[in-house]
Amino acid sequence: IGEVMGIFNKDTRPPFSGLKGRSPKELFHTLPTPCYILDESALQKNGQILAKVAQRTGCKILLAQKAFSNYNLYPSLSPYLAGTEASGLYEARLGAEEMPGKEVHVFCGAYREDEFSELLCYADHIVFNSPRQLERFGWLAKNAGKSIGLRINPECSTQEGHDIYDPCAPGSRLGTTRAQWDGQMTPRLVEMLDGIHFHTLCEQDADALELTLKAVENLFGDILPRMKWLNFGGGHHITRPGYDVPKLEQCI
């Protein structure tokens, strides 16, 4: 599977050109410390895998800067991605400045009123966490020409062993449940939306996505046809050897 998907392992990975063909182990004593050593050729290979998924499905794949914000390598990733995902003002600015010409998508659990106007200078898509948040900030974003989304909670847990990080765990305040939607989303707020967003996975395979999508369709299926886009969130371990790329593409 690794060869079919074009994924390197430790034996087939080419030398990192920045180290002139030598392994990092050979040069440890000459490197400044502490430091990170990144294999740019492997990074680009992963980018190619993502770009092929986007080409075959028509989806957009974004760089989650919360997970990787080494902006020196943004030029290496930019050709393969539609843009960046940010969790606040400074990540949005980073994506806009270091990956120019690409989209900037923002989701934040809580937006600061004193930062929101500046955030609008960088963001293309803004996702809100709750109907109340949407009501407070949505029209400011809409009038600025931004694409507006709402994060939903499909109430479908696919993770084991770390409930504290599970957005679908009981009591989670991340995303809007269907009950909250029915009780708080007025026709005026629904009309404001361009899309909906969910984020429930963490380094998981396409099986978990497939299960989550069934829950999304079950709870929000009547909403989906009225939306322009659906954001699958992060946590998809697409470049991992053995990841079921065909199933991912079928889900999309």
Residue positions per predicted region:
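Acidic, low-complexity proline/glycine-rich segments
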Residues: V4-R22
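N-terminal glycine-rich anion-binding loops that anchor highly charged ligand groups
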Residues: L19-R22, I49, I61-F68
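Generic N-terminal amphipathic, Lys/Arg-enriched alpha-helix
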Residues: L19-Y36
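A glycine-/small-polar-enriched, mobile loop at the entrance of the PLP active site in fold-type I
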Residues: L31-E40, C59-L63
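Alpha-helical packing segments of well-folded alpha/beta enzyme cores
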Residues: L43-N46, L50
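Active-site-proximal beta-alpha core segment in soluble small-molecule metabolic enzymes
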Residues: C59-W229
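Acidic, glycine-rich loop-and-beta core segments that form the ion-binding/anion-interacting portion
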Residues: L213-I252
